[in-house]
């Protein structure tokens, strides 16, 4: 709960916020142009030294601005919220340059990744296969020694360095799986590895790097500042910077996963790949489209972190102004230059999924073999499930890459809360019933055979009706529909809130007797997880606006969702908006949210 820690008094540092040899990619230079997608609709071309991905904390769905797509962009609605989960957003690839793909293939086959990586198993998921009616296969990259595929790309690039470069050492900036991959590679090659991490990095991840003999440098309270410092150290000390995805040698290392899948299974309908910066899918596609072009290569992203989908749609790299960090391993604001070029030429399309679906996929893998994936590690499985359901795929071989298992233990509770809803095994409902004797018994009789998994009620004096917030286990859709019909026939107004994120994240934890403060508005803010975040928030608003509610919910390692109630007179709403915008935290006014009106008013 770093977000609730106060900074020392007087601390004002609250900052938030085609020959093969010719395709070597560097950090983005001041001449690179890309598009910025802003939630405010202020979309613009940018030039600047932005290197890899620097997400702005947000747990809210991405709001996509209305931009005119290029002639060769994908036929997708301007708002990705209109795209159904599982629907393939087609890419119409050109196929790429044959000679270049051959050179990628040769390099992939010659890679030395097996000095550190295992040939990970491709396991049949019997329960998922039966449920979906397909042959569902999971590529178990979570079984690598560092519990992630990232060691492949990092090590492959490091094996290409000269003796002099290795003697000087390597450096990177990461608080995740890439850090361990670089540290392990350096240990194997007997060179020093410096890993720059934000000061807010959990101790368990710091120790994981130290256990691999990596030198940890803690700098800055954001990834942006950590990477800036790493690049400066690389220049000052002559170290080689190992990027997480945007380099051909990194892409080649990740591409070795493709060779293994193709050797382990034939006649594959589609391979589903989690997408962050694009290194993994670019490598897998570079291999498959040369040796088995009939196999579909489909990327999977969360709705709130759709940088590759947006980039393919607009025909150029797009930098997202807001990124949902729920699946923090793929929370990338700007995809790589080389990875985007390859994906544009090679992959068949993208699928988007919700955080609920990702959580359900974590549970599905646990049910299969008692293994727990991290959220980004289960992303491709969620996408493959959604795709098979949407298109009613039957009898085909479907492969999903389980990319990692470095789950932050504190995040498990949130995943558990969302898993049954995401798997359509639970429905979240609100029912109004008379505040009179016998109502509770009648309610239970109407629920009937449905299993109540959560129930919250509080007596409200002075009101004729009480609101009950509850969850029920769902075996079939018809069972739920029958129960809702029974409620309706008995004149008990019932609302299905299963898909309401505000309820799932906050309001289900806030049931109680109602109060009626005047001029109350509700806002959901995304706080960066760092000391001083709360103080900065409190300093941003006029003290004349009373805070009437405050509920904090951790979302991951980088940010937290906070629901706040303010008492703001109607004539001062515009002033409130100005101060909220100046704060620099992502936010949304939730007063018009259906659930907010039902539960809080």
Curated annotation (Swiss-Prot):
Domain ACT-like per the UniProt entry, residue ranges: 427-499, 521-592
Something else known: Plants silencing TD exhibit a stunt growth phenotype.
Enzyme Commission number, as recorded: 4.3.1.19
Family matches, as NCBIfam families: ilvA_2Cterm, PRK09224.1
CDD domains, A to Z: ACT_ThrD-I_2, Thr-dehyd
Protein name, UniProt field: Threonine dehydratase
Gene3D superfamilies: 3.40.50.1100, Biosynthetic Threonine Deaminase, Domain 3
EC top class named in words: lyase
InterPro entries registered for this protein in UniProt: ACT-like_dom_sf, Ser/Thr_Dehydratase, Ser/Thr_deHydtase_PyrdxlP-BS, TD_ACT-like, TD_ACT-like_sf, Thr_deHydtase_biosynth, TrpB-like_PALP, TrpB-like_PALP_sf
Described purpose of this protein according to its UniProt entry: Catalyzes the conversion of threonine to alpha-keto butyrate in isoleucine (Ile) biosynthesis. Required for JA-Ile biosynthesis, a signaling molecule involved in defense and resistance to the herbivore Manduca sexta caterpillars.
Annotated pathway: Amino-acid biosynthesis; L-isoleucine biosynthesis; 2-oxobutanoate from L-threonine: step 1/1
Cellular component annotations (GO), alphabetically ordered: chloroplast
Keywords, alphabetical: Amino-acid biosynthesis, Branched-chain amino acid biosynthesis, Chloroplast, Isoleucine biosynthesis, Lyase, Plant defense, Plastid, Pyridoxal phosphate, Repeat, Transit peptide
Reactions catalysed: L-threonine = 2-oxobutanoate + NH4(+)
Biological process, per Gene Ontology: defense response; isoleucine biosynthetic process; L-serine catabolic process; threonine catabolic process
